[in-house]
Amino acid sequence: MARFKDQIFINLQKKYSMNIIMPEGHEIISTKDESVSLFKSSLLDTFSRVYWFVPLLIFVPVIAYFIYVSISEFAFSIGNTVFLFLGGLGIWTVVEYLFHRFIFHYEPKSKPGKHLHFMMHGVHHAYPNDSLRLVMPPVMSIPLSTGFYFLFYFIAGQYHAPLFAGFIFGYLCYDMLHYATHHAHFIKASWFTALKQHHMRHHFQDPDNGFGVSSVIWDKVFRTEYKN
């Protein structure tokens, strides 16, 4: 098994790391639920995989804490807390779109840049149904959320708590919906079907458009809707 993993790693280095972004878009290697090794070290590779429910275990308590702080420490009314919470949720939708479009789909020129891009997002396009790489691993989500917390803290002052709670709630919605669009085939609701079709087109037809995952509104605003 170890030799098989090493061989995949070597193949990725030779075949994909130097040419992740193909002329037609992101190349799909497999649509099965299989997980390719990104590192020769099994320990490092473990940190690149995560079960879908892990973000809930980490961040639901964070959301609850900041809602509690909003009401008890900063004495916001429930109405104001909800209003600011929804504001944070709205901010997330913009960040989600911008990150996906300009960071995850940035086309690096250098070899290290291409390796990093493949580990961050290219592997998801190559193996779109890998159930262990559909939500953000804690090694990425915790540092990023910490950075955004301080951003809210320094910019929004006492309003940071409900805004940040809504922002993290938006992130969890994104993670859960992203996983669901790939694996929750039992959900038949029309809104979810439309969201799933939108994301599947991004993977299988037009990776240069359709960057919204939990919401399609910013694709409409910034004219990155599908052309046909």
What are the language-model segments listed below?
Residues 168-175:
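Alpha-helical membrane-embedded segments
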Residues 125, 129, 181-185, 204:
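A broad detector of the eukaryotic-type serine/threonine protein kinase catalytic domain
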Residues 181-192, 208:
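Interfacial helix-loop-helix junctions of multi-pass membrane proteins
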Residues 190-197, 203:
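Functionally important transmembrane alpha-helices
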Residues 75-77, 172, 189-191:
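N-terminal start-of-chain detector that recognizes signal peptides
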